[in-house]
Design a protein with these regions (language model features):
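Second-shell loop/turn segments in exported
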Residues: 1-2, 74, 103
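Alpha-solenoid helical repeat scaffolds
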Residues: 104, 131, 135, 162-166
Length: 191
């Protein structure tokens, strides 16, 4: 694995380029190699190789034309990504296929809180983006997101509201008690 990891970004990109759509061939060998490289560079003893592997995974995600393979690459990126990768990952939050993978990578990456809060401050957020951000805020227990979450409740559809309530329950303060109590009362729950 050391030799593969030492090939850096270009090596990761070359292996990723060998991935084919599932209906056209088998990827187990290449997936195993990429998984092994990622596991190798996440070991503290080999951390110096991590940045190049991350860069290779990001480039491979951008170049790959098959969604299932891109999802696999995201699953590997989430093990070694850093806050520096957050903006590149956030570009996929509105992608119907890759949004969940991008979101999980953002949630599992330390230091992405500022980017997530900046995304929440945008004016043109879709319901899907609000749901994704609410999920991320809940997972990260990000108390600074509460004002956004409370604002999004007004006019939210049922699915978005549910995700917002989950986030408020996880990271809200006293300001969230009233809307959470009202939502609970609507469903017949008593406090």
């Amino acid at each position: 694995m050391g030799e593969l990891a030492a090939t850096g970004s270009k090596g990761v990109e070359m292996i990723a380029a060998m991935l084919v759509p599932a209906d056209k061939g088998k990827n187990a060998t290449f997936e195993y190699a990429l998984n092994g490289v990622v596991a190798y560079v996440t070991d503290p003893a080999h951390e110096a190789l991590r940045d190049d592997v991350r860069k290779g995974l990001l480039a491979a995600i951008d170049r790959c034309g098959d969604d299932a393979n891109r999802a696999f690459l995201f699953s590997q990126l989430q093990f070694c990504s850093t806050a520096a990768d957050a903006a590149a990952m956030a570009r996929y939050l509105d992608d119907p296929y890759l949004a969940d993978y991008a979101l999980r990578a953002l949630v599992s990456t330390p230091g992405t809180e500022a980017l997530l809060l900046a995304e929440a401050g945008k004016d043109d957020l879709t319901a899907a983006r609000k749901q994704a951000l609410a999920y991320a805020f809940a997972e990260k227990r990000l108390a600074a997101a509460e004002p956004f979450l409370l604002t999004w409740l007004e006019g939210a559809d049922a699915q978005t509201a549910e995700q917002i309530y989950n986030a408020l329950a996880a990271c809200g303060s006293q300001a969230s008690v009233k809307p959470l109590a009202a939502a609970a009362a609507k469903t017949g729950c008593a406090w």
